[in-house]
């Protein structure tokens, strides 16, 4: 455990209180999403879609050739990851592996080792598929990384995952061991963590994956700053990210808040025309103008409160604890490790780490369609903002075709795949959006 002795008496926070707390925050999150998400992308809806998005047959064939191989590999990686997560968290295997780790006298260390082990298993079993996917990206001209650089990125992501997950579970264990209504405090802490992470991401995480340099003074920089000024958005700087060290894909985004806000442009994007750079940046300014990051962070924080509460309820489930081997039941049903508050014990016991990670991982996958539906609507609103700001629907459509061609994006992916994994409208939808916007003028 994380220091001290486990509190074994029944906490004041009963299961009923947790359900009420979950209901309140769950309803608040759903209402916030329902009322603030621009579900109607364009008044009157989109005009009929061109499935090929007006792209030439040669480009479509190149996209199909890449996607027909890369998508199955990506889906297989997701499937393997889900399977491993379920096996480790929902069978006794994970608990047995964790109990075999050294450091039982120092539970904080053992908990961190448990997190490192579970996440390492996930990385190792999916590594062949990830290598395959990287090889396909290289063959298609999408990836420019060396294998050494790619390996560093994999290890960096793993290290971040271990660090953040360990800190989170150490906090949960500490609260469960010391605080009566630990689940209440933990859920509020989860919401606060979302807020802190959103603020820290631009200055802590982004530099781990790219280097940034100020854009040289010139017509393009002046044009982008003027575009932001026309939009009423204060921008401190225009930066160029060395994305070409990893990819040929093009992109831009607006990062930071208030006086530290900056426009970030991939160096690969500079190979396009200034008009297309302006259009992509105009889209990103749309997110800022609509406070999408701030709004998403606040709703995400509310969702985290509800989600953490739900996790504590599931972690106390007799069925899940029995399946995970956490309750100490032998095959004949004898209970060697009972606790008056099963959820509290799931948090304190180091052997509960695989179960907690399984609940989080599987819940994230199940809720992905809802998260991505909101994301697509928000991205469509940013597209409309870019059209309003630039009044250039023809250039916008050309830019979308360029993005699809460069990034090898399927202009009309299967509906089920778009529903589950699509974070942005399809290329066909975005071009139809531009056509609908023009028709409405």
Predicted regions and their residues:
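Polar-ligand-bearing catalytic/cofactor-coordination segments
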Residues: 2-22, 33-91, 96-345, 361, ...
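N-terminal signal-anchor/signal peptide hydrophobic helix marking the start
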Residues: 346-357
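Final/C-terminal transmembrane alpha-helix of multipass membrane proteins
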Residues: 26-30
């Amino acid at each position: 455990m994380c220091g001290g002795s486990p509190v074994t008496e029944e906490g004041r926070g009963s299961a009923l209180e947790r359900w009420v707390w979950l209901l309140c925050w769950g309803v608040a999150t759903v209402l916030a999403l329902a009322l603030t998400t621009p579900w109607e992308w364009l008044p009157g809806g989109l005009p009929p879609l061109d499935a090929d998005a007006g792209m030439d047959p040669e480009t479509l064939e190149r996209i199909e050739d890449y996607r027909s191989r890369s998508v199955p590999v990506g889906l297989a990686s997701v499937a393997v990851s889900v399977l491993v997560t379920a096996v480790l968290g929902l069978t006794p295997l994970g608990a047995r592996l964790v109990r075999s780790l050294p450091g039982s006298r120092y539970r904080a260390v053992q908990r961190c080792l448990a997190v490192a082990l579970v996440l390492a298993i996930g990385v190792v079993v999916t590594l062949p598929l990830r290598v395959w996917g990287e090889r396909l990206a290289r063959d298609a001209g999408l990836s420019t990384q060396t294998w050494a650089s790619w390996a560093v990125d994999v290890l960096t992501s793993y290290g971040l995952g271990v660090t953040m997950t360990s800190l989170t579970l150490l906090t949960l264990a500490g609260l469960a061991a010391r605080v009566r209504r630990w689940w209440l405090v933990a859920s509020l802490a989860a919401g606060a963590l979302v807020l802190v992470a959103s603020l820290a991401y631009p200055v802590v995480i982004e530099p781990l994956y790219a280097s940034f340099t100020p854009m040289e003074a010139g017509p393009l920089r002046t044009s982008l700053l003027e575009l932001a000024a026309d939009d009423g958005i204060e921008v401190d700087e225009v930066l160029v990210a060395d994305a070409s060290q990893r990819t040929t894909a093009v992109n831009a985004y607006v990062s930071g808040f208030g006086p530290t806000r900056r426009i970030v442009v991939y160096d690969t994007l500079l190979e396009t025309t200034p008009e297309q750079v302006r259009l992509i940046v105009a889209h990103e300014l749309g997110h800022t103008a609509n406070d999408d990051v701030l709004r998403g962070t606040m709703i995400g924080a509310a969702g985290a409160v509800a989600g953490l509460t739900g996790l504590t309820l599931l972690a106390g489930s007799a069925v899940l604890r029995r399946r995970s081997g956490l309750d100490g039941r032998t095959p004949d049903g004898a209970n060697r490790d009972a606790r008056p508050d099963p959820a509290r014990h799931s948090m304190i016991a180091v052997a509960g780490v695989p179960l907690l990670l399984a609940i989080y991982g599987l819940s994230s996958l199940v809720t992905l369609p809802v998260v991505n539906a909101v994301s697509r609507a928000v991205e469509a609103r940013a597209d409309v903002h870019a059209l309003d700001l630039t009044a250039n629907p023809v250039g916008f459509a050309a830019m979308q075709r360029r993005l699809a061609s460069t990034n090898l994006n399927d202009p009309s992916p299967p509906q089920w795949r778009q529903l589950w994994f699509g974070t942005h409208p399809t290329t066909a939808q975005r071009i139809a959006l531009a056509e609908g916007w023009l028709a409405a003028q």
